[in-house]
């Protein structure tokens, strides 16, 4: 259901609104002028009538008509909405504005705060530069920096958005009345939904310490990590133009490729690809190239992603980087054109399997059958099997025989603690010895799969399970399993000695 603010946005024209403040020059289908929010000698402030947004390519600020008035008049977003409603004779009842709407406004304001802070912080700016991120790309993606919890809270209070922002769980509960920004002293990467609304953040530490290298916003009323893709909003037009998407592993892989002019790129949000993410991507393209790191972890992650994309009805093109290279390292050594050639020369999954099966027919046949089981289109499945049969004379009944695709098809009942344990193995990737833990044979088998990166062999309920404070819960459960494992070992020794 749309809110009063959604209706106001639809009923006012951004060109009319901004023209009341600035002299706009028509350029093609858009308008431009000097940016009022930073010293701007050459026009870098653009207004799009078709998208009803403004964007400055100098300082990075952007948004809708209401946000422009909010920034220009130095008033809150909601005060600006009331001002525009009054100016254009529209009714607006702030009491009826949904809680979600207020959360989106809060996230957008925090995004602005982070972006402005990056420009003022030399260390953070140098870090972004050191990663090979073009300044224009940094502005396009609204990269930022979290300098101070106190400064963030001050901005939120000034805009009457603190209560709304607390819904995101990005502010840690106050100690002695003081809130702590979850992303404090990190480079911040805004995560947007396909409509361009900021829904969460990723954070990358810029100093070497014991904290996690990357952190993400917790799941909240507007953000579900397993249901969104980083870069989709920025890349969707390029995906449409190119006819395919490139799936990479992480934030900076994507930003690096974007900086090199390869823009039809998306990434999961710091974790393995989920079925929901694959389904979302399939709405924008039916052809995906997987460009993961050229190491064991990257190969395993690719193997886990392929079935999810196939299940979503997508044609998959695995791209194999040389051993030990990630996309950034490959570009540095061989250049972006060589990467383009590698991508363009990568074959479709089944086409490649059929072409290379003779090298190891037994293994390739099983791999072919395994992936074939994820194709829901019966006609395509039969056609692929027929092609394999014609070339290698493997009986059709064997090729089409349903094989156990993964543990998602098994009836496995897992307790809350078992789900948390497996989820922790996937997300946190701890170095632990399973032999010292008190695990059932079934749970141990699943744990081995999780540690080996064989996530496609894990139950769907584990992969899609969402929980706050995962690390804390996992560590508590791990301690319990270690304690019970020691007790079991002692009992075993006692029985041997008696």
Swiss-Prot record:
GO terms for molecular function: DNA binding; DNA-directed RNA polymerase activity; zinc ion binding. It holds the Pfam family Toprim_2. Mg(2+) 2 binds at residues 293, 295. It catalyses: ssDNA + n NTP = ssDNA/pppN(pN)n-1 hybrid + (n-1) diphosphate. SMART domains: TOPRIM, ZnF_CHCC. InterPro entries: DNA_primase_core_N_sf (IPR037068), DNA_primase_DnaG (IPR006295), DNA_primase_Znf_CHC2 (IPR036977), DnaG_bac (IPR030846), DNAG_N (IPR013264), DnaG_primase (IPR050219), TOPRIM_DnaG_bac (IPR034151), TOPRIM_dom (IPR006171). Monomer. Interacts with DnaB. RNA polymerase that catalyzes the synthesis of short RNA molecules used as primers for DNA polymerase during DNA replication. This is DNA primase. It comes from Aquifex aeolicus (strain VF5). The lineage of its organism: Bacteria, Pseudomonadati, Aquificota, Aquificia, Aquificales. The gene is dnaG.
């Amino acid at each position: 259901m749309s809110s009063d603010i959604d209706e106001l946005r639809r009923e006012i024209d951004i060109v009319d609104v901004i023209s009341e403040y600035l002299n706009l020059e028509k350029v093609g289908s858009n308008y431009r002028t000097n940016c009022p929010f930073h010293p701007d000698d050459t026009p870098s402030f653009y207004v799009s009538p078709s998208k009803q947004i403004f964007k400055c390519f100098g300082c990075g600020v952007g948004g809708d008509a209401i946000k422009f008035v909010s920034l220009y008049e130095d008033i809150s977003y909601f005060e600006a909405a009331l001002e525009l409603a009054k100016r254009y004779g529209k009714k607006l009842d702030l009491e009826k504005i949904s809680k979600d709407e207020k959360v989106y406004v809060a996230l957008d304001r925090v995004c602005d705060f982070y972006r402005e802070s990056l420009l003022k912080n030399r260390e953070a700016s140098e870090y972004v530069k050191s990663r090979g991120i073009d300044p224009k790309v940094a502005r396009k993606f609204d990269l930022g920096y979290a300098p101070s919890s106190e400064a963030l809270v001050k901005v939120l209070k000034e805009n009457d958005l603190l209560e709304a922002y607390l819904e995101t769980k990005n502010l840690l509960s106050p100690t002695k009345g003081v809130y702590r920004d979850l992303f404090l002293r990190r480079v911040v990467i805004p995560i947007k939904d396909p409509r361009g609304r900021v829904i969460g953040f990723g954070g990358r530490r810029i100093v070497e310490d014991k904290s996690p290298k990357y952190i993400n916003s917790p799941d909240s009323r507007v953000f579900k990590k397993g249901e969104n893709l980083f870069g989709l909003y920025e890349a969707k037009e390029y995906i449409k133009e190119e006819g395919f998407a490139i799936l990479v592993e992480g934030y900076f892989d994507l930003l690096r490729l974007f900086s090199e002019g390869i823009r039809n790129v998306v990434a999961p949000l710091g974790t393995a690809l989920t079925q929901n993410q694959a389904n979302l991507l399939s709405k924008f393209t039916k052809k995906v190239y997987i460009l993961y790191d050229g190491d064991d972890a990257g190969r395993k992650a690719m193997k886990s992603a392929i079935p999810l994309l196939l299940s979503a009805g997508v044609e998959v093109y695995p791209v194999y980087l040389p051993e030990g290279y990630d996309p950034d390292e490959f570009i540095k050594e061989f250049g972006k054109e060589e990467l383009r050639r590698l991508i363009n020369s990568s074959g479709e999954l089944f086409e490649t399997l059929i072409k290379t099966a003779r090298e190891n027919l037994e293994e390739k046949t099983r791999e072919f059958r395994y992936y074939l089981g994820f194709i829901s289109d019966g006609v395509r499945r039969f056609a692929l099997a027929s092609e394999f049969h014609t070339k290698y004379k493997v009986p059709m009944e064997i090729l089409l025989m349903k094989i156990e695709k993964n543990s998602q098809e098994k009836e496995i009942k897992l307790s809350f603690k078992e789900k948390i344990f497996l989820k922790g193995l996937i997300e946190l990737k701890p170095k632990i010895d399973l032999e010292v833990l008190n695990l059932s044979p079934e749970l141990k088998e699943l744990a081995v799969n999780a540690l080996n990166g064989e996530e496609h062999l894990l139950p769907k309920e584990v992969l899609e399970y969402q929980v706050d404070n995962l690390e804390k819960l996992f560590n508590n459960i791990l301690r319990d399993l270690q304690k019970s494992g020691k007790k079991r070992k002692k009992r075993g020794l006692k029985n041997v000695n008696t």
